[in-house]
Every structure is written in structure tokens, then in C-alpha cells.
């Protein structure tokens, strides 16, 4: 019926008699709610909040990937500044539950209440996504690692052991969220249960054979959410267009939620595109996927909702330094996000908007320390062209109210005079405004294609432009051409320049349009009769033509900003792309809808965070990285402007703005990293090392509930003994002689391991980007065996995290251990890992922060540790880089302290840079520690990441900083590593990071550490 109606609407629209059919389209889709509130409603077209339709343009960030609560404001202000109406976040069960007796939502960055409070202060709705499973390229997909042993079943089902495990966490996060719902005046609008759990059906979803176990699990999650106060709509995110799970339109089977959604990563969620072919098919750059028919078939009575749409891609081990932004950069943002609009999507959340890092052991094996994700906000918190390109569309969707209710009237090349260009016509059945999303017929092609567009307007069918040069799609680009677009009390008959935003000052609208640099635009304002040029910066060939009961304007815009005024009170600002990147529309209200009278327009700065109007004073906050002008369009009553609290000397321009200038920030220089000290960190390799202390446990279990049984006994799975992260040390004892040992270790992609016998190095598995398990037959031929005392074989292995989804239970540890040439075998094994195991010795940094290296267990990485008896390291200097070297296969820990004194009223981002000197071996692994936090894993033999941003709060910008590097040499060549740091960017900023008191995030060394030697 829907498709037939759409075809009828296309025909009627072309004939100009569509109103009756449009009325039918409206009445076909009644508003729905969940029966618990009518604040959040929805229908076929969009979500509706407090009676208003909204285009939800959201972006994801993970607070646990930036564990400095003060910086959450920075990320959220940048998301808001880009025109977004919402943001989303995963809550991490793992981050809050170090063991099965603890749920911590109060310590440090584990207190998530500031996120909800910031949302209300800044004016953005929240999509809350608590799991309990989240995927997210997180260790075990966000499961706490104590559930990966098999003791809690196979997970993600209705097994009571698993239910009892997740219930305390899920109850707590649900109760917290329940206090911040939009139904009670706060800003959380939906609550997602589980994640990409497309398991409602056994086999082919079209056969609708229920998976009763999965349904029972979803019912448990739903009941918990409702029992603990959630009245918001419950949502899910299908992992792809094949699963059709949990939507009421598809089936009335159990487990259904209020609103289903679809996740999509059309250019692959990883830089390793081979991982996505089973979902997306063969990879073709910039090839789009069709969503409209999926939503029409799977959930026609619901909005086209995408809880995750590709905001970038994660960088796997072996991927390029800095990620793979080539086909997921600003062109991707321009094309694919507009494509979604052409598919009638009215709610989408970009995954990720800010990725951040994977400090400690937060990552799954698929990725390294960086979680930059090529997101619009980089992991160092800078914004780049992709951010600005995304902003151009998000600001448009925030202002285009009619876009929230449209039908797809038709699509194809018949709309254009160039067969290389196609258009999708969306039309609002109530207002008759239309949106023509234009694309290359083959979106993988990047040719420069000129075209005219046939549009149906209130003045009849027109072919535009009529006077200006043709519309162009130059490169991997898309454009949305509007007709009968309402701005304030005025109407735009059509515009071939894209709408950026608009605002109404003193009852007169200011419309902002933009074109790519050097291109032409044409627009027609209904009711206008005369136009004039008030500012021409880069404009040419300006024409005003009276027609269609209004005034048509055509012009070409090179670099700069042009301002036109019309006799009906309309002001039009036309920008080229570069100028549009530096154009902002900060809200004067915390209403996410941002009413048309509640914003100002600003051109010039690197970032505008906020604006507040008080009487005749406009207070603007933001960032400046270079000297720039500040051009402010505001109500006439504004007489003075401040920037970050300082008065700006402004003057009135002839085009109605207040204009001033902003100075560049003062430069800074980081002190050199020098005066290194070092000490061996592998005493455990020697046979006479005493492993009877608190750090060690007997590895003596003869059974396991893990579905993967070991080849040999005892069970040498580290998680079974409460040690879950990174480096673990196994000491296997045996008496008498043996010719060698066969050892098989599993640690995840890019893991490695090394072996020593009685202090003598035997061999290493160096690792690679794909191998998760590796065995070696170790020869004892050249080693010294003891005949009168026990021999000790030390196995040091790291792991790169636990696998995601069904792989979360894959063991980490020794799968098989056999002596060769010996009948007696190993007498016993001892195991050490993170100091205190699951006891959460350092609740601020958390159990995922540390591995089992001696240096970490005893706290050499912590501020305040006394290294006065250490010898100073004679580190070589390569330019400003310190080169730290040693010989032999061992682990060595390097340590220094360095002060910072960052000036006030600035935002500074700092990265460490690790390197391997030319000609030196890459057969080593290293970990970077900053004030006790492990903030980088450097595996030069495998990966390419060399730059490690470390945020303020982890770094002390007004004090001493403790820097540590643990280097594990996997060959007798030893290792040489270079280390330096650099400023990523410096901004004059309202953030004023140097003034923050963050010392509570950096607890120091305590005597308790001594017992873990």
C-alpha cells in the first residue's frame, strides 16, 4: 500500500494536485507512544518530543575512553557547536564492575551524572546505551572480564548465572538514568537495551521462527528497565539489514521494544575492509547502501532510525598511523550523511563523533591504543575538515523543520538533464516543501558533473538554475536542493545553494547559504522585490530578477562571505565552503530545538562553543588558534561583545554585524624529557626469585567451566585465577632433566610471548596482526639445567584483550604445556598478574589500567615512588628525542619526571611520540605510563601507531609529571626506543584547562605496593 501511495503522490505532485493524497499519507501513520508517557512519541516520519517533531542528529562518545570528567564538557560543547540535537553514549559494565561484588558509579570518571547534567545545560538530548553488552571494540565487548571464565555460562542469554551477574550493574545504571528522563524535565529521550543483538529468530528471519532463549533474555532486560524507573521508549539497534529483530512491525513475538533501529557501516567499520564483505558485499569506495525499502518493509510505522551510522573506522593492528581517513573523511561525511536524508532517515547517530583512546587494557584485540576512529573530533580533541563538513549538514537539519515529515516521492535521473546525476525527491505532505537530494548516479565516481534540476514548487514545475551557472557535483559530493523552504515568516521558492541555517533577529530573518568555493548559486525569495549587495567578498556575476511573485538572485561565490539585503527585510549570507567551515550558529537557549529567535550567527573563529545574551551584552565563548576576525550577526539591541570574558573592540558594519578581531594565543614550548632512570623489571626470570608473595597464586585447577578445555593440565587460563589484563607471568617448576618444552599460548591478535629457563632466554613469539594463538617448541640445549634444585621456566605473555561477541569466552593463557624429554612433567605452576587481581587496588584508574609486570605491581609507574637509589640512564639524544637503550632479552623500566606550566585561558593538547631508531631492532614491546596511567602500547614489530595523545587531567598542566616506559625486549639484541612529546594544538579558549584541579585523578604510590614484589 505504501509503495502504491508513493507512486500516486509522485504523479499527483507533478500535476500540482497532491493535497488530498498528502492528507491520506498523514492519516495513515498515527502517532504512537509506549503507554507510559506522551512526551516522546513517534510515527512513520520522525520522533516527536513534547509535541514537536525533531530531526535527531546525534554523535557517540565514550566517557570511559576519556577518563577526565572535566573534558566531557569540551567534547559535548563541540558536538553541540556542530549543530547536533543529541548525543549518545555506551555505559561500560566492565568499567564499573571490577569484580562480581562491586558496582562503582561514584569514583572519578565512573560518576556519569555530570553527563546528564551537561546535556541539560548545553541543550542536547541523550540516547542512553547501557548494554550490558556494547561491543565497541572494547575488551570482551564491554563485559567485565570476570564473566569470561565460563562460570557464568555462554553469556547474552537467560542463564540465571549470567542474569545474576548483569543485574546489579544494569539496575544501577538504569536507576541513575531514570532520574534524568525527558519526562521529568531532563534530556534522556530513549533507552537502548543490549546492542546489535539480532537474535530474535532461528535461521531465516522471514520465516519468523522465534529464538525463545534470546526472547527470554530481552524480556529480562526490559523488565529490569521498567522496574527501575525507565518510562522512556526502549530501543534496539539491528546489526544489519538481514536480522529484522525486536521490531513490532515485523512480528508480535516476545522481546520487542518500542522503536527498532538499524546500524550501518557502508564503508566498513575497520580499516581492514575484508572484515565487512560478508555484511556489505565487495568493497567499492563511496558505494552507498539502500535503506528506504528496508525501513518500509521492516518498520514502516516507526521513524527511519539509525542508532549507529558510520562516523569513521577503527584502525586495526598493522593499520596505518593515524587511521584510514582517505575514504571516510570530509567527502564521506558530505556524501553519505546526505544519502541518509535522501533515504528518509530522520534520526541518526554517528559512531563515533569522538573516539578517544583505549587506555590500559580497554581495547579488544582488533585495535591498538588509538580509538581515533577518523571521527569528526580527533582523539587529541582537535576538529578537522570532517567535523566542519558534518556541521554544514547538521546545522541544516536543525533548522529544516519540514524535513522531519516527508515522503519519498520518487528518485532517478529523470529529475536532471545529466544522466550521470540522480535525485531523490522528499516532500512534506503538510507544507508541500520539498528536498531534492542529488548524487552521482554511481556514487563511487568522483567526476565533475554539471546539471539542471527539475523541481516542483508552489510556482509550478521549474528547471533550475535559470540564470546562474549549473549546479555541480564535483568529486564525491552531494547537494540538497530545497523548494518552498520556510525561514521565519518568509519562504524560499528554491535555492541551488545549500541552506546552512537561518536565524530571526528583530522579526527579520537572516538566511545563510553556501556553495563550494568558486561555484554558483541561485535562489528565489517569495515576496521580495528588490535586492542589494551589502558586502561582496568573493562574489561575482550578481543578478536580481523579478519573477514568480518574488525575486530570484544568482551569483558566483569565491573565497569569502557575501551579504545581500532585500526590501522585505530578508538578509542572505552566502559563504563559500572555507568560510562556511568557520561559520557558527550558537544557541542562546538550552532548548535542543533551538527556536529561530534563539541563536546568533558568527563568522571567523576556530570554534564557537556558546553564546549568552544579557540585555545589550553578548557573551561568546570559544577557541582561537590563529588571529582572526569576529563577525557577529545578532539582534540590534546588542551593543557590546565579549570573547571568553574579555570585551572585544567591535564596530558596526554596513551589512548589520558587529565586527572585531581576536588575537592568536601565546606560543608555548614543552620542556625536554630528560634525566631518565631505569631498572630491570624481570627478576622473575631467575630461578631463585621468591614467588611466595602476595602477587602470586598457585595455578592448580584441574577443571574449568570454559567451553574450550585445555590440552594439558592444570588449567593455565589466567582469567580463571582472577588475572585478566595484558602481561601475565607463569613460572613452571620441574625437577631433573628435560630437552625442551612445548608451549602453546593464546592471547588475541598481535599478542606475543617470551620464555626464559633459569634466567636464560630461550625464544619469543613476536606476534603479528592476525594470529591469536601461537606455539613454540623450546629447546633447552643451550640452557643450564639444575640437577639439585628445581628448574623454573618463565613464560611472559601479554594479551591484547578478550574477543567480542561469542568470542568473549576464548581463554587467555597457556593452552598446552608439556616438557619434552622428561617423564615427570611440571610439578606446579605459579601465576602473577595485575597487583591485587580483581580487588581494585587503584579504584581511580581501575583494574584495566595495569598489567602484571614487576614495575607495575610495585608501583614504579606511579607519582611519588622513590627512585632515588636508581642509577641515572645515559639516554642518547636524537634531536629532541630521548633514546632509551639496553641489551639482552628482558624487561626494563625507564622513568623520569618533568614539570609543565601551561598558561591560563588556553586549551592545549599534548601527545607523546614513540619511535625506533634507524637500524635498531623492532623485536620489542613497550608501554607508556603517564602519572600512573598506561596510555600507550607500542609494538613496532606489528603496528604502526607512534603518536599517543594524553589528555589534561592525566597530565598535570601545572605541576610535576611522572613519565614511565616499560620495554620488553623479545630478543637478545635488547631494545632502543625513542620518546618525545609535542603540542598537537594550542588555543586561546574558554576551557582554561590549566586552571583545573584534577589531582584526585592522579593518586600516588602507597606502601601497600611493596608486598606485590
From Swiss-Prot:
UniProt entry keywords in alphabetical sequence: Carbohydrate metabolism, Disulfide bond, Glycoprotein, Glycosidase, Hydrolase, Polysaccharide degradation, Secreted, Signal
Main location class? secreted
Sequence similarity? Belongs to the glycosyl hydrolase 35 family.
- Could you say which residues form the signal peptide? 1-21
Residues involved in substrate binding: 90, 135-137, 195, 265, 373
Record's subcellular location: Secreted
Q: What class of enzyme is it?
A: hydrolase
**Which positions does UniProt annotate with glycan attachment?**
100, 211, 411, 442, 456, 626, 735, 768, 775
Cystine crosslinks: 271-324
Name the Gene3D superfamilies on file.
Answer: Beta-galactosidase, domain 2, Beta-galactosidase, domain 3, Galactose-binding domain-like, Glycosidases
InterPro entries per the UniProt record, alphabetical: Betagal_dom2, Betagal_dom2_sf, BetaGal_dom3, BetaGal_dom3_sf, BetaGal_jelly_roll_dom, Galactose-bd-like_sf, Gly_Hdrlase_35_cat, Glycoside_Hdrlase_35
Reactions it catalyzes = Hydrolysis of terminal non-reducing beta-D-galactose residues in beta-D-galactosides
Active site residues per record: 196, 308
Origin superkingdom: Eukaryota
One GO BP on record is: polysaccharide catabolic process
- Cellular component aspect of the GO annotation: extracellular region
- Give the protein's biological function: Cleaves beta-linked terminal galactosyl residues from gangliosides, glycoproteins, and glycosaminoglycans.
Q: Name one GO molecular function term.
A: beta-galactosidase activity
- The Enzyme Commission number assigned here is 3.2.1.23
Name this protein carries in UniProt:
Probable beta-galactosidase B
